UniProtKB/Swiss-Prot annotation:
Gene3D superfamilies: Ribosomal protein S11. It comes from the Bacteria. InterPro entries: Ribosomal_uS11 (IPR001971), Ribosomal_uS11_bac-type (IPR019981), Ribosomal_uS11_CS (IPR018102), Ribosomal_uS11_sf (IPR036967). Pfam families: Ribosomal_S11 (PF00411). The gene is rpsK. The lineage of its organism: Bacteria, Bacillati, Bacillota, Bacilli, Bacillales. This is Small ribosomal subunit protein uS11. GO terms for biological process: translation. GO terms for molecular function: rRNA binding; structural constituent of ribosome. Located on the platform of the 30S subunit, it bridges several disparate RNA helices of the 16S rRNA. Forms part of the Shine-Dalgarno cleft in the 70S ribosome. The keyword Ribonucleoprotein applies. Part of the 30S ribosomal subunit. Interacts with proteins S7 and S18. Binds to IF-3. Interacts with VmlR. Interacts with BrxC. GO terms for cellular component: cytosolic small ribosomal subunit. Keywords: Ribonucleoprotein, Ribosomal protein, RNA-binding, rRNA-binding. Belongs to the universal ribosomal protein uS11 family.
Amino acid sequence: MAAARKSNTRKRRVKKNIESGIAHIRSTFNNTIVTITDTHGNAISWSSAGALGFRGSRKSTPFAAQMAAETAAKGSIEHGLKTLEVTVKGPGSGREAAIRALQAAGLEVTAIRDVTPVPHNGCRPPKRRRV
């Protein structure tokens, strides 16, 4: 009774030839996540400050956001990406740094769009911090 065993090898990543895509930058007070997708929304590459080894308050710095954007850009350039639209979400400090890093990596930014959700007086916000 030999049970069918699942092989240990991972599926090799197929190189996609994509000319243009969308960079989704989510910049919160604690972290910055950069996901680069094709125009249909399928992820090509992603990176975040936490995934790069930044911990604690260093995750929320503009430098950490810059490094995350560079890493995501390198992964997407391998798939043939040349032009990007950028959507930025959130109030964090790494917004501008991440956009600049994408441009410095050799990607042409065609549009920058702010898609930060703004409530029309929805949920009650958390109470103010007193430090």
